[in-house]
């Protein structure tokens, strides 16, 4: 509590184009998604002392990480569980806050997630790379300049698959010859803070304990499948 009193509002960094989590609405310019559910569920959890949050949107995960290192934000909402990458980036990760079902789009007739596959990833998709290297370390990551290029690589057979949130896989499939296959490992999403900021991490882990079980994961599906 002392930390919050001295520090004031907790500055959250989020991704502006993160469907279901923090997709910025073009009219209100505010994020829509489970970031709002988290804030409303936990802001009063410490009793008399309400936790205040201040939101800043970013175009990419790299920019979020840089802002965290520069002390322009206190935490990132959200990263994927990956202890090795966290250590490389001098950050610590919270307990899992919510989980997302993940699918691959592939042209391979008999796709097997337990074999070594070549996965196309757009260069700036840090979350995707963290998810793959943690859950499927034996897959070979091939980077492309954009998700459109990654898509093309799979269509042409240059790569076996690319990874998407399960809900979006169906939208992408409408205009493609590929098929969507759900992976058995979900994406475990967590908060990130700098390594020194253990007090805030303790506070965040306590807020996660107060969340109704899998509430945010199920809310995520509602947002992701909303028409639009």
Regions from the language model: what does each represent?
Residues 25-28, 90, 101, 117-118, ...:
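Residues at structural and domain junctions
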Residues 1-2, 33-46, 108-129, 133, ...:
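Extended ligand-binding regions for polar small-molecule ligands
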Residues 27-34, 56-60, 68, 96, ...:
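Extracytoplasmic/periplasmic, Sec-exported soluble proteins
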Residues 1-85, 140-152, 204:
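Extracytoplasmic small-molecule ligand-binding "clamshell" domains
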Residues 19, 36, 40, 52-115, ...:
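Acidic, polar ligand-binding/catalytic clefts
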Residues 11, 103-105, 190-192:
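Residues embedded in well-ordered beta-strands
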Residues 80, 103-172:
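Pocket-lining segment of extracytoplasmic ligand-binding domains
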Residues 42, 46-50, 72, 77-80, ...:
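Sec/Tat-exported extracytoplasmic proteins
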């Amino acid at each position: 509590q002392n930390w919050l009193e001295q520090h004031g509002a907790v500055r959250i960094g989020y991704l502006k184009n993160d469907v279901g989590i923090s997709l910025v609405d073009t009219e209100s310019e505010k994020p829509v998604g489970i970031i709002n559910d988290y804030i409303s569920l936990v802001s009063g959890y410490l009793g008399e002392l309400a936790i205040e949050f201040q939101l800043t949107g970013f175009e990419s995960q790299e920019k979020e990480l840089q802002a965290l290192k520069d002390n322009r934000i206190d935490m990132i909402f959200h990263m994927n569980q990956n202890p090795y990458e966290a250590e490389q980036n001098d950050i610590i990760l919270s307990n899992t806050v919510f989980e997302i079902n993940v699918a691959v789009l592939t042209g391979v007739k008999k796709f097997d997630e337990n074999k070594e596959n070549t996965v196309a990833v757009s260069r700036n998709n840090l979350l995707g790379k963290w998810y793959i290297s943690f859950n499927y370390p034996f897959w070979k990551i091939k980077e492309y300049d954009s998700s459109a290029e990654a898509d093309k690589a799979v269509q042409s057979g240059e790569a076996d698959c690319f990874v998407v949130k399960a809900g979006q896989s169906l939208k992408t499939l409408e205009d493609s010859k590929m098929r969507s296959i759900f992976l058995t490992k979900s994406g475990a999403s967590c908060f990130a803070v700098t390594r020194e900021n253990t007090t805030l991490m303790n506070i965040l882990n306590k807020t996660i304990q107060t969340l109704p079980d899998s509430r945010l994961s199920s809310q995520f599906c509602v947002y992701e499948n909303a028409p639009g």
